[in-house]
Amino acid sequence: MNIEIREYRNEDRDEWMRVHAIILSLSHAWNYTIQERPEYEGYTSTRLVAVALENGQSRIVGLTDVQYDNTTGELCFLKDSRGGYVLELGRLPEYKGLGIGKMLIDAAAEDAAGKGFHRLEYWTQDRTAQRFYRRLKMKEIGRHYRFRIKPTPEISALLMQDRVGAEYVYCACLPDEWPLVKQKYDIIQKHPLEPHLCVGFEIRF
């Protein structure tokens, strides 16, 4: 079996969506499902797929998408230069151990450099992905908690002034603030809305 990294094509859409859905179901990296393939209108982007070639047949088994800053700090956390924010990275579980993730990261970096960008940011709340990035010696650049709270009476009253109801409020805070936040607010703990620690990593090239 050979693995090839190539650019995404429009005819890949249905297969890409299927692979993305499988990866999403096994990861905590995403907060929502999607029914349309992201296009990144108005932005420079990288869209790559990993294709397995077996017995004369080919199938998409991994993917990565990068969206690039139009202006410094527009998308990326670090503000020293324009970079790429990696929105998608994953591979099918049955292809574990073949180095596909590293191949996609390397190919994305090469494509980014060809477009004039020299750094990529990888943010994830999935612990397996965090361990993977650490094994690759990526530099950690930040962390924060992502969580949902039940609206306080004050928040509910403010929104109801415009006849807006809120089932929950999606929030973020720094780790140092997390203990106080847990004491002060009614945080939703039940899956799939439970809190996660999101960690950011960076590569430069």
Report the location of each language-model feature.
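Glycine-rich phosphate/pyrophosphate-binding loop shared by adenosine-nucleotide-utilizing enzymes
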Residues: 56-63, 84
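A short beta-loop-alpha structural element at the N-terminal edge
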Residues: 2-17
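Conserved GNAT acetyl-CoA-binding A-motif
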Residues: 112-125
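Active-site rim helix/loop that mediates acceptor-substrate recognition in acyltransferases
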Residues: 20-53, 63-65, 70-74
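Conserved catalytic-core motifs of GNAT/GCN5-like acyltransferases
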Residues: 123, 139-192, 197
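Conserved acetyl-CoA-binding loop-helix of GNAT-fold acetyltransferases
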Residues: 91, 97-110, 135
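Conserved acetyl-CoA binding element of GNAT-fold acetyltransferases
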Residues: 75-93, 123
